């Protein structure tokens, strides 16, 4: 009997059909970036200070410039963190309507030292030094309410986590295409509703709904294109699918620069999702999934459609996809399948840890470097460019030395770079930046590798579930990373880097325990996945008897 990989060798492993499908799914990948990192622009926090009606009237009467108004009426102006808090969150508790106040240094008539004047929290709102708007400026998510911005980002990661578990199961149970279209529809509607949210609470609800479906949709797209192409092109489309995400980062920076209003920006980045609903007529169901569910007739119909699109025909000798008579009923994925057998259990635990590590180091290094500066658009753009060399290195090495060693080395390089940064003195700033970029490049490679290899280690009927469950650990990492960075820096500025170093080095060592997937067909059954490990001893070359008869391969 034939496998899908056998048939693709004859009808085209990456011909017209696969190229068109990849292009459509790459658009989906790029459109995910505003949800994953859009907080940089949607939640931008500009310089701000308390607004006082009395001080504003006095400024107008005296004809002060903006600099003079800030100097005369805002406490604690200075470079220190304490001074920044005072200037942004506190005000002088004085009556600005007093007739004794002069236009030149008005507070001098009340106290010889203005530091002796009583201070209080802002009562009438804030003045924001920005021409645009963000959720911070509209809902005043600053000072005592700054935690609400953290919650805004945390809730989308909670959505990522729940959605990965829920939709991953549904995609393996009811099909990739159905779940992909459902996630696109919900993402489009919730994104549009978020743009017109009347208050913070409703905005939070729609943000959660976006998180619930958006990441799962991105990963389903990854699984789909991986299952449509032949063995020789899996790694290429996997890497290019993630490069499309990086291209989305660059486009997002440009769109955010052109549209500085957060509501219109949210509309702009949501609109493509409505266009993606047309994929109902453009992208078929995965024939690999159909075969795993014993829907052989439908699978062969799609395979013939692919062959026709590629200008090929399916050889008669390869059209026998009928399972054995005793193959039993179609397989239903279960969470227990991810840990039931020894090798798959090992794969699951190592992959979960590496997803967690990639998220913590990727986001943590960005936070620790403090990339956001005077121009967030350029900073964001330049930081995205770092990801292209990482993808280029993977393309150069992955077919020459395999997946496992580049993946392990990239984790170790990231960890070693973090450790080296601890011992570099501050006066060698150029060296610290260079090492930091090296670490960012290493963890970017690791992030791309874990996504690529994850899909190659699971059998077809639990592949989508395995990818989404394991990748949910990066959502846990995304939730705790801000606390990890900011709490540990209170103890010692370099403390987070020490933690990152240990986590990264351990991740690299664990990768070496995984089997090499270079040049191997995607496992179709649990038996295939259990026997992926390189043979060592004769007694280890066995098929696990606990695998059910229904799990036999079709060929």
Curated annotation (Swiss-Prot):
The record marks 451 as: Involved in recognition of organic cations and participates in structural changes that occur during translocation of organic cations. Glycans are attached at residue 71. One of its GO terms (biological process) is organic cation transport. Gene3D superfamilies: MFS general substrate transporter like domains. It is found in: Basolateral cell membrane; Basal cell membrane; Apical cell membrane. Tyrosine phosphorylation of the transporter leads to activation of the transport activity. Inhibited by cGMP, most likely through a cGMP-binding protein that interacts with OCT2. Contains one proline-rich sequence (Pro-Glu-Ser-Pro-Arg) that may be involved in tyrosine-protein kinase YES1 binding and is required for the activation of substrate transport. Electrogenic voltage-dependent transporter that mediates the transport of a variety of organic cations such as endogenous bioactive amines, cationic drugs and xenobiotics. Functions as a Na(+)-independent, bidirectional uniporter. Cation cellular uptake or release is driven by the electrochemical potential, i.e. membrane potential and concentration gradient. However, may also engage electroneutral cation exchange when saturating concentrations of cation substrates are reached. This is Solute carrier family 22 member 2. It comes from Rattus norvegicus.
């Amino acid at each position: 009997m034939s496998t899908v990989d056998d048939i693709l060798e004859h009808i085209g492993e990456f011909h017209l059909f696969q190229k068109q499908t990849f292009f459509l799914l790459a658009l989906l990948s790029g459109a995910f970036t505003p949800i994953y990192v859009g907080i940089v622009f949607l939640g931008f926090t500009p310089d701000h200070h308390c607004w006082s009606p009395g001080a504003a009237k006095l400024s107008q009467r005296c004809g002060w410039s903006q600099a003079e108004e800030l100097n005369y009426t805002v406490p604690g102006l200075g470079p220190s963190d304490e001074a920044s808090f005072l200037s942004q969150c506190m005000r002088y508790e004085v009556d600005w309507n007093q007739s004794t106040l002069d236009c030149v240094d008005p507070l001098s008539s009340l106290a010889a030292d203005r530091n002796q004047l009583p201070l209080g929290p802002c009562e009438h709102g804030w003045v924001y030094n920005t021409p645009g708007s963000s959720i911070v400026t509209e809902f005043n998510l600053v000072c005592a309410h700054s935690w609400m911005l953290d919650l805004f980002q945390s809730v989308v990661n909670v959505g990522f986590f729940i959605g990965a578990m829920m939709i991953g199961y549904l995609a393996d149970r009811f099909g990739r295409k159905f779940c992909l279209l459902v996630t696109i529809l919900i993402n489009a509607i919730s994104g549009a509703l978020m743009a017109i949210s009347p208050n913070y609470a409703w905005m939070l609800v729609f943000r959660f709904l976006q998180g619930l479906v958006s990441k799962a949709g991105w990963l389903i797209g990854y699984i789909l294109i991986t299952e449509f192409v032949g063995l020789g092109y899996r790694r290429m489309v996997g890497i290019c699918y993630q490069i499309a995400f990086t291209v989305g980062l660059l486009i997002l920076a440009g769109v955010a620069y052109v549209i500085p209003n957060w509501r219109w920006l949210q509309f702009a980045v949501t609109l493509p999702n409505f266009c993606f609903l047309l994929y109902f007529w453009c992208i078929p169901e995965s024939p690999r999934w159909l075969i795993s569910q014993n829907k052989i007739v439908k699978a062969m119909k799609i395979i013939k459609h692919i062959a026709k699109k590629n200008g090929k025909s399916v050889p008669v000798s390869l059209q026998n996809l009928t399972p054995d008579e005793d193959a039993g009923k179609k397989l239903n994925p279960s969470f227990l399948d991810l840990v039931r057998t020894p090798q798959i259990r090992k794969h699951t635990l190592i992959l979960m840890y590496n997803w967690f590590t990639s998220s913590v180091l990727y986001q943590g290094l960005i936070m620790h470097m403090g990339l956001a500066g005077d121009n967030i658009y350029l900073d964001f753009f330049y930081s995205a460019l770092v990801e292209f060399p990482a993808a280029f290195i993977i393309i150069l090495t992955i077919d020459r030395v395999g997946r496992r060693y580049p993946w392990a080395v990239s984790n170790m390089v990231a960890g070693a770079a973090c450790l080296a940064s601890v011992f570099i003195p501050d006066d060698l700033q150029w060296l610290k930046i260079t090492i930091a970029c090296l670490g960012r490049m290493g963890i970017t490679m690791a992030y791309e590798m874990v996504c690529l290899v994850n899909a190659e280690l699971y059998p077809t009927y639990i592949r989508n579930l395995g990818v989404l469950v394991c990748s949910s650990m990066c959502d846990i990492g995304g939730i705790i990373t801000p606390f990890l960075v900011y709490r540990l820096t209170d103890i010692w500025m370099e403390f987070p880097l020490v933690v990152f170093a240990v986590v990264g080095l351990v991740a690299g060592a664990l990768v070496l325990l995984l089997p090499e997937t270079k040049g191997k067909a995607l496992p179709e059954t649990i038996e295939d996945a259990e026997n992926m490990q390189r043979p060592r001893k004769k007694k280890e070359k066995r098929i696990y008897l606990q695998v059910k008869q229904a799990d036999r391969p079709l060929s």
